[in-house]
From Swiss-Prot:
InterPro entries reported in the protein's UniProt record: 4pyrrol_Mease, 4pyrrol_Methylase_sf, 4pyrrole_Mease_sub1, 4pyrrole_Mease_sub2, Dphthn_synthase
EC identifiers of the protein: 2.1.1.98
Protein species of origin: Methanocaldococcus jannaschii (strain ATCC 43067 / DSM 2661 / JAL-1 / JCM 10045 / NBRC 100440)
Binding site for S-adenosyl-L-methionine: L9, D85, V88, S113, I114, L164, A209, H234
Lineage start: Archaea, Methanobacteriati, Methanobacteriota, Methanomada group, Methanococci
Family according to the record: Belongs to the diphthine synthase family.
Swiss-Prot/TrEMBL catalytic activity: 2-[(3S)-amino-3-carboxypropyl]-L-histidyl-[translation elongation factor 2] + 3 S-adenosyl-L-methionine = diphthine-[translation elongation factor 2] + 3 S-adenosyl-L-homocysteine + 3 H(+)
Keyword Signal: no
Presence of keyword Methyltransferase: yes
Pathway: Protein modification; peptidyl-diphthamide biosynthesis
Name of encoding gene: dphB
Protein name listed in UniProt: Diphthine synthase
Role: S-adenosyl-L-methionine-dependent methyltransferase that catalyzes the trimethylation of the amino group of the modified target histidine residue in translation elongation factor 2 (EF-2), to form an intermediate called diphthine. The three successive methylation reactions represent the second step of diphthamide biosynthesis.
Biological process terms in GO annotation: methylation; protein histidyl modification to diphthamide
Amino acid sequence: MLILAGLGLYDENDMTLKTLKFAKKAEKIYAEFYTAVLTGTTTEKIEEVLGKKIHVLSRKDVEYNGYKLIEEAKDKDIMFLTAGDPMVATTHVDLAIEAKKKGIEVLIINAPSIYSAVGITGLQLYKFGKTTSIVFPEENYFPETPYNVIKENLERGLHTLCLLDIRIDENEKRFMTANEGLKVLLELENRKKEGIINEDTKAVVVARAGSLKPKLVYGKIKDLINYDFGEPLHCIIIPGKLHFMEEDALKYLCENI
């Protein structure tokens, strides 16, 4: 059996009792921390809670050698752990599909993810439109997708969740800050010039969602862009049309600057 289980958002205390139960039954436990990462803990602390060794896989291991993991699950209980919810990343969905194709039983254990955690802002989840990702710009690479998604969502009165780039491999460990993400959005406006985003556009920044002390800050981009949000992970929300209760939530649940 292949067990796909989420670890939640922040530390080793976020995993469910169900994950703990099946981890104790699993013959081998794998994990990946390149699509998302728990910044409030370490692999060693998670191993201590589970009472078992975790074999951490790289992006290359999962994307090119994932079939080996599936082969093991033919006659063993194999657990694959991820930060957040296990079915958010398409790579994990692909593992589940391929296992099913081979007649292998698949158990999915859901967990808190950023998609549910943004509810701490008080913004109504059903009013979020398409999610987008803001990545680190590179030479000859400056994706316009975030700008286009925000534009489409705003036209429909919907909020936009902007996930920020994570770079984790053997040579690099880098998390995009909300400040960097906001600068990218302003640069996209400078290039596109469609009047969608400017320094007076209001945004919400969520830092360390899932922790006991998350940071929620609401204000204009010009005020947020130099604010110190502290340790990662960060995300940005561009609100759409606000219900009066959402306005109250942003006023009382977030720090207003």
